[in-house]
């Protein structure tokens, strides 16, 4: 999707109402994103942590041109079809030159929170859990580089060669870039069917097939990982029930194990049938931010996250996706992603893990480093 015919950009105030009006007035393809901090439009919450990226909280656009890959065929849709423009676009594509911008060879990636500080923060979250304030919290930390120059297309290509995820996204809005290799779907709607696929549970891949199978089996049977996943699956069930036809919410798969190039993941699938009195934007508002990136109970977890994290999440742990003209949607979860503000020469990526009463801070730290591995590789 390229070239904005119309667009909407806003902060968190009345964001979902503005999006609903925009979607219903255009009734066209819309592409864009929702930042994690739109939580402040849904609940009485705030975001005061450091923000080195300064992305808008919400941005969607109605494209002039749409390129749809269907199997081995390319379908091109133009908002206002003009034969001369189609020909000119094909010539431009064929003559397209590779960007001469090179990624800094000496890019210095820094960790926002030291290991010692991270372990202390996780211990504080565990104390909250043992006191009964929450059951689980998804705690994240940022890696960043200042005065940085990268080639976004080159980095995106490398990242997806390493990971080959199902919901990858390259998104450019002026000087803001998202290079995402996410394996997680947040929300899909087809007709009246709504689907959410939360990920909770991660295990390392190994080159040795026997060792790799052992890691996969251990993940499937790990009581802590299953507990994390089941808690979030229950939260998603509850969120979907708010806009669902009575009795239609189902867990289609619980704690399924899926293998990606870098890691094994535990994924559950929850579905519902949309009650006709609710719009698709209301489904998003009542399920956002996704439970896999907050914890449970959601509001209490988000408050504790804000206290302990040192970076504003922004688009990280938000969602990127589209609205189709018929009202269907598909959105991913922005994880395993690199964010780049070209104007500020600032590169950022964040990783996190679910903290429960069974968490060992050192192991949570190691899980974060495992998730950061692919992004560090492509940037270094």
Label the model's feature ranges.
Residues 1-380:
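Extended alpha-helical targeting/anchoring segments
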